[in-house]
Amino acid sequence: MPTIQQLIRSQRIKCETKTKSPALKACPQRRGICTRVYTTTPKKPNSALRKVARVRLTTGIEVTAYIPGIGHNLQEHSVVLVRGGRVKDLPGVRYHIVRGSLDTAGVKDRLQSRSKYGVKRPKS
């Protein structure tokens, strides 16, 4: 606990919070172009082929982004929208691609949690 005299001499230092998605430069989403679309395997207890893409953002930074949902239409030079959000079992993947925007199509035949996968309401 500092004395009043010590506080007069120098103010308290503000704690700066470190961002978890620095490549977005304090924006909610960023546009980018896919440079490579491939699959990776997750960390130890899990086993799968996770779909990821290397994306060059408009900020000029190249990041690895996860492609959520079953099936996708992405290939090299596709224009995508990237949001923050890491994938726990893929080291180095700290971004998600937004489904149903720009060149990314929504997930086919999806009926639940549609808004997260860019799917319009089905005709009843």
Swiss-Prot record:
Record's subcellular location: Plastid, Chloroplast
Disulfide bonds: none
SUPFAM superfamilies, per database record: Nucleic acid-binding proteins
Database matches in InterPro entries: NA-bd_OB-fold, Ribosomal_uS12, Ribosomal_uS12_bac
A GO-annotated cellular component: chloroplast
Major location category of this protein: plastid
Coiled-coil segments on the chain, per record: none
Pfam families cross-referenced by the UniProt entry: Ribosom_S12_S23
GO BP terms: translation
An annotated Gene Ontology molecular function: structural constituent of ribosome
Keyword Plastid belongs to the record: yes
Keyword entries, A-Z: Chloroplast, Plastid, Ribonucleoprotein, Ribosomal protein, RNA-binding, rRNA-binding
Subunit composition and interactions: Part of the 30S ribosomal subunit.
PANTHER family hit by this protein: 30S RIBOSOMAL PROTEIN S12 FAMILY MEMBER (PTHR11652)
Family statement: Belongs to the universal ribosomal protein uS12 family.
Reported function: With S4 and S5 plays an important role in translational accuracy. Located at the interface of the 30S and 50S subunits.
Protein name (record): Small ribosomal subunit protein uS12c
Source organism of this protein record: Ostreococcus tauri
